[in-house]
Amino acid sequence: MEIISPTRGSRFPNARLGLFITGLIVFACALLGLRGVDWFLLKKSLRHKFTKIEWISTSELADWLASKRRPAPVLLDVRTEEEWNVSHLPGARCVDPNASAESAAAGLPKETPIVTYCAVGYRSGEMADRLRAAGFANVRNLEGSIFQWANEDRPLVHDDERVSQVHPYNSFWGRLLNDDVRAPVK
């Protein structure tokens, strides 16, 4: 397991505001019991926030990872170590959400295909933005991120063993996970 730490003094204050606004949208839908609408509005909000990055669907990524015709992308899991330790996509690298692009992609050529993901796509969208700004041109953010991946029963691992649950980030965002894949918050 590789964990990449943030560079000193690296903080992104707009992340909290963006998560708050996106959270309000999801909360409003949750009150109405509209889980499908939650996801629709969340994805729409994230695409509006991160207009300069490319997105990849979970089915497109699954096909890419299964393909023998093209090299697999580097998967950057942009969640906390606590979240990572519950589960992650097979072959992913754990990257601190506040890490610089240079730290997150240390040792990778600028043309390397990279796919970022987090819980729902916000933190990984910020990382994809930073990577793109640092000259990495082949970066995509996973739409729906690990929550959607898990809800679709796609492979998750912990210590190289298949697992089925995902850290819910918190009780609010965890509502986007199906009950059977939501790990208990400790």
Regions found by a protein language model. Name each.
Residues 75-77:
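Structural scaffold elements adjacent to functional motifs in cytosolic proteins
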Residues 79-82:
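Short, contiguous, well-structured surface segments enriched in hydrophobic/aromatic residues
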Residues 2-70, 85-112, 125-186:
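Rhodanese-like catalytic fold shared by cysteine-dependent sulfurtransferases
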Residues 117:
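Short, surface-exposed ligand- or partner-binding patches at beta-edge/loop junctions that are enriched
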